[in-house]
Amino acid sequence: MPTLTANGIRIAFDTAGDPKAVPILLVHGLGMQLTAWPDEFVEGLVELGFYVIRFDNRDCGLSTKFEQAGAPNLALAWLKSKLGWRLRSAYRLEDMADDALGVLSALGVARAHVVGVSMGAMIGQILAARHPQRVLSLTSIMSSSGRRGLPGPTPQARKALMRRPADPTDIDSILEQWVTLLRTIGSPSYPTPEKLLRRRVARSLRRSYCPGGVLRQMMAVAAAGDRSELLRSIAVPTLVIHGAADPLVPLACGLDTAAQIPGARLEVIEGMGHDLPPQLIERLLALIDAHARGKMLPDSTPRLFVKQ
């Protein structure tokens, strides 16, 4: 896996397609490596004529880890957030956005379409707001503005997210913990086949496992707080996609994200949770392609994709 130096750290990356084609940068979410992007999704973008760039966020995969910062106390952070106190983190989402920008610069890419998922969409939002000259368009999937008062995860999703492996030294226990989490937050109407889910998790764990990095990324998200003002400054064409059945980042968060970004287009997908299930890849590719090529209808009425 190739690496590059950006923003003072090592970042693992991968590219697919013709470097002369229109570039599209994929930014994944909490604890998710670049290999978590479904192969058919990446291949589909290449077939549509894009030059696909994906990378491991800091503290994840094969990119630089920040173990020297230690593991944050999430319980204490939650209490502080409830009291309205300012949270400190090992790094900020702004730093992660600078990482993404550094990847583009290191690869000689002047401008790119940006597609972000969950935390990755938050990073994409910051990138689009702070560096609009480098972003052709933004697609924000299953994410949030961080505005106070928005609903949080369901009890089941929160429990699965905070659950630790029965034996943190046993790879099978770790695999079961991740499979349980992904199954819990996944799309109820479009479940990922069990064998495929386990194969993906096993591949990820063989490549890298950094639980401390997940916690530090969670702190970066928590410390970011309300980004509504930043979202209102985004001027690049923006598409917001959200699942109506998302238990981790509820639909209200996606609706608010679209409402905050001027001119944003909203697509709500019925039965979709907090994942990119095989059954929806074709639909997601069509939406992203139409948005990137400026072929979406100009109205701002939310569109609902209902399972046939």
Regions found by a protein language model. Give the residues of each.
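Conserved acidic catalytic loop of the alpha/beta-hydrolase fold
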Residues: 87, 94-112
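Active-site nucleophile elbow and catalytic-triad environment of alpha/beta-hydrolase enzymes
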Residues: 164-167, 213-230
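Flexible "cap/lid" loop of the alpha/beta hydrolase fold
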Residues: 138-168
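Conserved HGGG/HGGXW glycine-rich cap/lid loop of the alpha/beta-hydrolase fold
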Residues: 9-83
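Catalytic active-site module of serine/aspartate enzymes centered on a nucleophile-bearing elbow/loop
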Residues: 264-308
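Short beta-strand/loop motif that positions the catalytic acidic residue
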Residues: 234, 240-242
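Acidic catalytic loop of the alpha/beta-hydrolase fold
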Residues: 245-249
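Conserved alpha/beta-hydrolase catalytic His-Asp/Glu region
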Residues: 172-215
